[in-house]
UniProtKB/Swiss-Prot annotation:
Keywords of the record: Activator, DNA-binding, Nucleus, Repeat, Transcription, Transcription regulation
Cellular component, GO, one term: nucleus
Biased composition (Acidic residues): 136-147
The name this protein goes by in its record: Myb-related protein Pp2
Transmembrane regions listed in the UniProt entry: none
Compartmental location: Nucleus
Keyword flag Chloroplast: no
PROSITE patterns, sorted: HTH_MYB
CDD domains listed in its UniProt record: SANT
């Protein structure tokens, strides 16, 4: 904040003082003495500001002022004081009684400064000037005004300040950049004895295995925002092997799928479709013992998958909960029998579903497998067979027997389903 102004300067006079104003100011100060300069104009009846009254009294109306030319002793004193104090005219005027600072400054610029230059001395430092700088300084003095050099500080002091500024190294200010907000931890709802609990889900580690799903799969992995990943298949890739889908599904760096697959993968790689079929046939005797004695033809043994493709017989359209009875002697397919509650309890609902869906060819479903068709089928009805009501009608229809060339496709489908399980 600057200095408070001496007055509002509204309705005040400016310009040179008149003799009447000088008389009012002198009479007031001689009668009342010096006081606050802001209050003197009102007390003396002047339309002037306090600063104007102070300067008029100090420089012109003061009774102890000296008028006339400076003496030689005063000139020598001014030169000595300027060599030590510089352009501090008010302090120099304090050493010369009866002389004002403005009067001393004007006398220095008009007389004493030129005298020093004529003697070969620098007026700012009072030291001898070099011959090379003498002409330059004389040209500068001709262009300078009377009061411009008096107001500013000496060149020596300026040069000293410049050298100090250059010597000081610039301080580097470290600016702290704010960090962005941390992402919120991922939570997962888990059931416990006390109730539902929210647990933090650890960040999934990046898998070193690179996934190339190909045109049939769209792979989307966003490990920064979600711990799960999605793999979608297109239905137009009907004849694509299911192992590619399983590879893409299990190679995704998700948690806990990737950890689970790392444990299961060595076991599944050791299996082959031929070994699985041979192991399936080895359990036929055990499976036949589960059927009750009321079905003697089922106890005689279950047919093999190769025999089903080679036999030319009428196959009924499969219905959930129904198991076709096959005559091993080469006879026609017998009437479809319904599972009783005891049979369903002994054999198991899952076993009946897997046996029906995998061991017998389906006339209403194509041999080529697609994920889209499998998902659409699961949306309407269960994959596993359920027992039919006792009064369900048995409709038979004659369908063409699939050719033996489709056996390899059925084996691939069976292997893919076992891998998924």
């Amino acid at each position: 904040m600057g200095r408070k102004p001496c007055c509002e300067k509204v309705g005040l006079r400016r310009g040179p003082w008149t003799s009447e104003e000088d008389q009012k100011l002198v009479s007031h100060i001689t009668n009342n003495g010096l006081s606050c300069w802001r209050a003197i104009p009102k007390l003396a009846g002047l339309l002037r500001c306090g600063k104007s009254c102070r300067l008029r009294w100090t420089n012109y109306l003061r009774p102890d002022l000296k008028r006339g030319i400076f003496s030689e002793a005063e000139e020598n004193l001014i030169l000595d004081l300027h060599a030590t104090l510089g352009n501090r005219w008010s302090r120099i005027a304090a050493q010369l009684p009866g002389r004002t600072d403005n009067e001393i400054k004007n006398y220095w610029n008009t007389r004493l400064k030129k005298r020093l230059r004529s003697q070969g001395l620098d007026p700012n430092t009072h030291l001898p000037l070099e011959d090379s700088k003498l002409d330059d300084t004389e040209d500068d003095t001709d262009d300078e005004g009377g009061d411009s050099s008096d107001v500013t500080m000496s060149d020596a002091s300026k040069s000293e300040k410049r050298s100090k500024k250059k010597s000081k190294p610039k301080e580097t200010v470290k600016v702290r950049q704010p960090k962005g907000p941390k992402p919120a931890p991922q939570l997962k709802m888990c059931q416990s004895d006390e109730g539902p609990v929210l647990l933090k889900v650890p960040k999934a580690p990046k898998s070193p295995i690179s996934v190339n799903p190909g045109p049939g799969c769209n792979y989307d992995d966003d490990s920064e925002h979600s711990s799960s990943s999605t793999v979608t298949t297109k239905s137009h890739e009907d004849h694509r092997d299911s192992s590619d889908f399983i590879k893409a599904l299990t190679s995704v760096s998700s948690f806990p799928e990737a950890e689970l697959w790392s444990c299961i993968k060595p076991i599944t790689n050791s299996f082959s479709s031929t070994a699985l079929l041979s192991e399936w046939d080895s359990y036929r005797a055990f499976d036949s013992s589960l059927f009750p004695s009321s079905y003697p033809q089922l106890n005689s043994g279950l047919p093999k998958l190769e025999d089903v493709n080679s036999k030319s017989s009428a196959v009924a359209s499969p219905v959930q909960g129904m198991l076709p009875a096959y005559n091993p002697m080469g006879m026609e397919m017998q009437t479809r029998m319904q599972f009783s509650s005891q049979l369903t309890h002994e054999i198991g609902q899952n076993y009946g579903g897997i046996f029906q869906e995998t061991c017998y060819p389906q006339p209403d479903m194509g041999m080529s497998w697609s994920m889209h068709a499998e998902l659409s089928h699961c949306g309407t009805e269960s994959l596993f067979a359920t027992p039919n009501p006792a009064n369900a009608p048995s409709n038979f229809e004659e369908v063409p027997q699939p050719s033996p060339c489709t056996t390899s496709q059925e084996l691939q489908r069976l292997a893919a389903l076992l891998d998924l399980i």
